[in-house]
Curated annotation (Swiss-Prot):
Organism this protein belongs to: Caldivirga maquilingensis (strain ATCC 700844 / DSM 13496 / JCM 10307 / IC-167)
Identification of the protein by name: Small ribosomal subunit protein uS11
Alphabetically ordered keywords of this record: Ribonucleoprotein, Ribosomal protein, RNA-binding, rRNA-binding
GO cellular component: ribonucleoprotein complex; ribosome
Subunit and interaction comment: Part of the 30S ribosomal subunit.
Function noted in UniProt: Located on the platform of the 30S subunit.
A GO molecular function held by the record: rRNA binding
One Pfam match: Ribosomal_S11
Listed NCBIfam families: arch_S11P, PRK09607.1
Keyword Chloroplast among UniProt keywords: no
Family: Belongs to the universal ribosomal protein uS11 family.
Record InterPro entries: Ribosomal_uS11 (IPR001971), Ribosomal_uS11_archaeal (IPR019961), Ribosomal_uS11_CS (IPR018102), Ribosomal_uS11_sf (IPR036967)
GO terms of biological process kind: translation
Amino acid sequence: MQQLRKLRWGIAYIYASSNNTMIIITDLTGSETVARVSGGQVVKADRDKPSPYAAMMAAYKAAQIAMARGINAVHVKVRGPGGYGLKVPGPGAVAAIRALARAGMIIGRIEDVTPIPHDTIRPPGGRRGRRV
């Protein structure tokens, strides 16, 4: 007979931009941070921060910390830069979700929470744009 393990849920916030990937795991209310790791903490070179490899290593490290503190299942919220920036998450988002699953965490819902403007916002640089 298969033994059922008790699931303790948390929320994994994955912020994937073109410069870095951050993984933050909180409890279900979102008020207490359990683990917080970025891609820059696990690679040496700055150019490697946004890579899928850095996101994978950061997600694995965050999952180990969270599982040591008792959280073994997460709902994932993926976020890109949004606003006047890119509306799609960076290259590390999918790799981070895959690494969370491979680390032994149970994945619940996956949701995109990128901030999308409903009319528009004024881009930086003024009326004539950025002069180079």
